[in-house]
Amino acid sequence: MQLTHQLDLFPECRVTLLLFKDVKNAGDLRRKAMEGTIDGSLINPTVIVDPFQILVAANKAVHLYKLGKMKTRTLSTEIIFNLSPNNNISEALKKFGISANDTSILIVYIEEGEKQINQEYLISQVEGHQVSLKNLPEIMNITEVKKIYKLSSQEESIGTLLDAIICRMSTKDVL
């Protein structure tokens, strides 16, 4: 149902992904996240192609956190920001964060060392059904993904969609 992954560069950190469908209280969850009463990033799964995309964003967020160079105020927001192909924080939050009308939500949280997130509490806050991450392709909107990342048909013929997305995410600080 969930995916928990230890970060290679930061073995003391674990990233957990929880996917929910048929969510009825996305607006309340968004408000709680903005108030800081929910530990985790609330992500719109329609723009996520693969869990690896999240792991790359989370790894970068932890790296910048450790360096004291995050561009946002919280680790949760930094993960969402790192999914974006550009450096506009508010645009990243609109496109990759959840909105009040969303019916699918991906919750991502990071635990470090002995620090534990109360997963049962987190799950209990969602009025919806937790589903396996294997359902992600059914939820994803390929047209929206291509639009957000400005992917060309030429790029798609050279490599995979995921490769192009990771490339966009990784090079935004360079360009």
Swiss-Prot record:
The species this protein belongs to is Homo sapiens
Q: Identify the disorder associated with this protein.
A: Galloway-Mowat syndrome 5: A form of Galloway-Mowat syndrome, a severe renal-neurological disease characterized by early-onset nephrotic syndrome associated with microcephaly, central nervous system abnormalities, developmental delays, and a propensity for seizures. Brain anomalies include gyration defects ranging from lissencephaly to pachygyria and polymicrogyria, and cerebellar hypoplasia. Most patients show facial dysmorphism characterized by a small, narrow forehead, large/floppy ears, deep-set eyes, hypertelorism and micrognathia.
Q: Which Gene3D superfamilies match?
A: CGI121/TPRKB
Q: GO CC terms on record?
A: cytoplasm; cytosol; EKC/KEOPS complex; nucleus
Q: Name one GO biological process term.
A: tRNA threonylcarbamoyladenosine modification
Give the highest taxon in the source lineage: Eukaryota
Where is this chain's protein located in or outside the cell? Cytoplasm, Cytosol; Nucleus
Whom does it interact with, and what assembly results? Component of the EKC/KEOPS complex composed of at least GON7, TP53RK, TPRKB, OSGEP and LAGE3; the whole complex dimerizes. Interacts with TP53RK/PRPK.
Task: Identify this protein by name.
Answer: EKC/KEOPS complex subunit TPRKB
* UniProt cross-references to Pfam families, sorted A to Z: CGI-121 (PF08617)
